Each structure stands twice: as C-alpha cells, then as structure tokens.
C-alpha cells in the first residue's frame, strides 16, 4: 500500500510572545529593535506571536504589522484579541488569530513581580532566588549563574555562559551576542528551549536520556551537542 503524501501530527513549539502595550508603531518598533540588538543571535529573524490584549480597537494594525516586520521579526500569529473588528482586520492582513491556552492567573489581578536580588561582578551575574514564569533575566556581557529553580515560562539570556544549579524548566539562551564558545550547564535539564549563539533545541529535540539529568551543552562544528555533567 502506497504511503499517503501527507500526514497530520500534533506537536508543540516554543515561540516568543510579544505583548504590545503601546499603539504607536514607531515606539513599538524602537523598543523591538533595542530587544533584538540585545540578543541578535536568538531574536534576529525569529518567529513570534503578537499579543494585543492590552490594546484598543483604535490601533492601526497595518502600520503596526509593518513596524514589527521592519525589525526582522516574523509574525506567525496574533493572540489576545477580543475585539471582533480588530480580529477581522488582522485576518485580512493574512495572519491567523490564535486562541490562547488556559491562563494561570489574570495578569491584571497579579501584583508586579519584585526585582530579583542580584549580585554582580565584572564577569558574572548571580541570581539566588527562584526565577518565576514570565520573568526574564539578561546578563549583558557576562555569565549568568542561577542557584535556584527556573519555572516554565521563565527566560534566561546571557552574552556569556549560563549555569543553573536547580530544576530548569524555562528557556536558556547563552551566547546571545553570537559567541559560539559559550556553554550551558544545568543540574536538572527539563528546559522548554536551550540555545547557544542562535543554535537551539526545543523540548522535543533534547535527547530523552538527558531529560531531567545534569547536562552540559555546547557547540561543536556549529551544531548543538550535549553530554552528561559529572
């Protein structure tokens, strides 16, 4: 029996979600360009989802879409849209309007997360408290050391190496400025995504024998490799 030319399978992908809090396309573009410049190896030409939950129907979606695309990001969908007219406008622009998954808690009812206590040296940023879902830690021009757990939905970015001495369930992006010599060290690897200088694996790509284990990731011949951390 001949094989079917197509096959439908369920899968999951880890994408960055950009939450818009301003209706001015120029302001949004400048903010995005700054973010991309901080981590070009990961964000340049990256696929993203745009969340418009905080915006009103008065937004000029065509101009906003052009502003976002001008930064090099690729929009794969729009979430958080409650206004029917805005949904129709987005659909006419050729983008799917995505239904969001179950939220843990309404962000409007959640108090702002306090800044994490940080100790810094010339080449290391140290975080000694848990990194919770929705938090992003960026270690500019240095290594990042986390001595506690990292929740799913949290993001670690470092221009240098990343060390996690706890359960790692979020995303870890080392060598964000393009340094291919950077590494990721983790005592319990259950990450949603790991990346070194823009080369990344999502959760499904991490070899099963290393999941939940102490691991070291680095680049060899331009490809991600992993080995047990003793």
Swiss-Prot record:
InterPro entries referenced in this protein's UniProt entry, alphabetically: CAP/MinC_C (IPR016098), MinC (IPR013033), MinC_C_sf (IPR036145), MinC_N (IPR007874), Septum_form_inhib_MinC_C (IPR005526)
Family membership: Belongs to the MinC family.
Function according to Swiss-Prot or TrEMBL: Cell division inhibitor that blocks the formation of polar Z ring septums. Rapidly oscillates between the poles of the cell to destabilize FtsZ filaments that have formed before they mature into polar Z rings. Prevents FtsZ polymerization.
Subunit and partners: Interacts with MinD and FtsZ.
Protein name listed in UniProt: Probable septum site-determining protein MinC
Gene encoding the protein: minC
Gene Ontology biological-process entries: cell morphogenesis; division septum assembly; regulation of cell division; regulation of cell septum assembly
Pfam families, alphabetized: MinC_C, MinC_N
PANTHER family: SEPTUM SITE-DETERMINING PROTEIN MINC
Keywords on record: Cell cycle, Cell division, Septation
Organism: Erwinia tasmaniensis (strain DSM 17950 / CFBP 7177 / CIP 109463 / NCPPB 4357 / Et1/99)
